[in-house]
Amino acid sequence: ADGGSTTFPQQLTITKNIALTQSDSDGDYSGVTAVFTSGEALEAGEVVSIHTDGEVYKALADGTTSGAINADQPAIGVVVADAADDSDVIVLLQGFLTHNANFPTYTVGATLYVPEAETSSKCVPELDAPDSSGDFIQVIGYAVHANRIFVNPDFTVIEIT
């Protein structure tokens, strides 16, 4: 109740709904998260995938970078706060994230994709699906506001030939 954490040593049964909240406040998030080690410096809102070294990297659809997605290594979520290389980073696996500075102005209701390339050195979800031969297409979520997304990765990854 005071913002701390509670540990349940056994199975937890919830008989009511779990509410995820949307917030207009910059940097707010709610949902399912996990802590990983960053394989490079990451910024809030960037899409990530797990590399073979077990660390998370910027996920790109171009198939050539450390975090390049493919059918065996899809993007898993979005970073909720900036993180230095080789540090703990919180990844939103499913839920809502608001970010004014790093997100472009999204079209409400639009499907969002793993980006084909970084924009202004950021790897944030894009409105346009990748379209070049050798790229991979993966839905990462949906725009629910001009600067708020619902992260809900679809683990289906399609290669453009």
Roles of regions detected by a PLM:
Residues 1-14:
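Beta-strand-rich receptor-binding modules of extracellular spikes/adhesins
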Residues 16-161:
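Glycine-anchored, exposed beta-strand/edge motif detector
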